[in-house]
Amino acid sequence: FGYLKKNDWFHLGIGSNLTLIDFKKRKEIRELEVGIDFNYDADTSGNSNPITIGQENEFTFFNSSKFQFSWDLKTSGKDTTITRKNVDFPYVKNMGSLSFNIDYESPSYGIWEYDWRIGYEDAEKYKSFNSDGYRRRYAKVGGSFYPTDNYRIGFTARIRSEKEWLNWIENNELAVYDLSQKIISINMNWYRGTKHEIRLKSQFVALQAKNPRSLIVNESGYLTESFKDVDPFSEGITSFQIRYKYEIVPLSYIYLVYTKGGSIFENNIMRETSEIFKDPWNNPDNEIFSIKFRLKY
């Protein structure tokens, strides 16, 4: 149970968890953790966000693998943040939705392991404009490879698509898009004794928002069609860093760091996904090589 009040916003949450460990007929299961949560948010003017009821079930097996499935039910309510605290248009009314997620983490296969996740969310149709209802689909797959104790490389790919993704533009002007987001992450860690360490972190994001439809929200929070032109857009984001650390003496280090990254936003220009990934890498906002020292006296 928890209660939090901050500035013009407060949150009330109630949750319960139960762990089961005695599975005589399914001896491969080590434990099952079952949880349920209730969350309520609102601003101090009495505008209530959607109430959320969530339920989660996680199986842990003796081979160290895990399987989880969960669902969340959201009621209709008011989104009090999307219009950036506009005094005349303080919120947008959202429709209720149901979401479901499944996760799996594999056991270790000696030198490698993997995990995946799939999820969806479907919402009711808006009645104030020609709506097909919000829909979200999500998939993730990842893996790690560790042929030796001192070397590990990990890879993760995420794909997310949304129909009627709602985006604020300015004042009471909004738009819904068909959104596609793809994320690739690669990480690596290598060390030799206590003297040498190389660490790589990287993430590449490609976002596309297509088929925009212009909307406006009235003082009561209802969305209606607008005739204003809205452009599709795309954005690519790159974050890359490789770092070498050398221990001079215990607790004193020298770091050689190479960082490269940036973002490129294109309005009304549709690009291929490969171009969205490559553009911020080929035209970065920053590219820095630095040397740092950390000395203990």
Please annotate each region the language model reported.
Residues 1-297:
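Exposed, low-structure sequence patches enriched in small/polar residues
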